């Protein structure tokens, strides 16, 4: 009888711990379909896609703003954008290359990266704002960094 009681207690303890562990995990964003979005958001997404294909849609809250992050491809290149819950386009990030950006921006990025390896280069466009250039890179120690500059090569805070 003591063995049964001990086994029962151990099972309850493990069940309780596994439940606690499950609740402690961060929630994964739910992947959505275009049809799941409010009509105003659907309209902005369709206009912004420009014939591209949606890879994924996730709802998130960033800087206190409820928004939808749309990951897409256009002509084989990554093109991601965020749309506010009210349908406003917030930002468009599109894959590009160092060779395709203004010379001053390229030079500033190359100075920052010096000795590191560029992993991605994207245009960073917010409606009504100048176009920016965002570059992700790994330094010589393998640590990941990002740099954001304007067309003149000046550092910009997002």
What do the PLM-derived regions correspond to, one by one?
Residues 2-8, 12, 16-158:
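Long, terminal "pre-/pro-" and other extracytoplasmic accessory regions
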């Amino acid at each position: 009888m003591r063995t049964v009681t001990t086994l029962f207690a151990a099972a309850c303890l493990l069940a309780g711990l596994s439940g606690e562990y499950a609740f402690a995990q961060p929630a994964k964003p739910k992947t959505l379909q275009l049809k799941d979005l409010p009509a105003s958001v659907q309209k902005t997404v369709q206009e912004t896609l420009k014939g591209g294909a949606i890879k994924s849609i996730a709802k998130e809250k960033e800087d206190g703003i409820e928004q939808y992050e749309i990951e897409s491809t256009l002509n084989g290149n990554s093109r991601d954008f965020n749309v506010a819950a009210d349908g406003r386009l917030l930002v468009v990030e599109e894959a590009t290359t160092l060779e395709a950006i203004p010379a001053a921006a390229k030079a500033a990025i190359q100075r920052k990266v010096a000795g590191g390896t560029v992993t991605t280069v994207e245009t960073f466009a917010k409606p009504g704002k100048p176009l920016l250039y965002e570059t992700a890179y790994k330094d010589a120690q393998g640590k990941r960094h990002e740099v954001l500059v304007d067309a003149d090569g000046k550092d910009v805070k997002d």
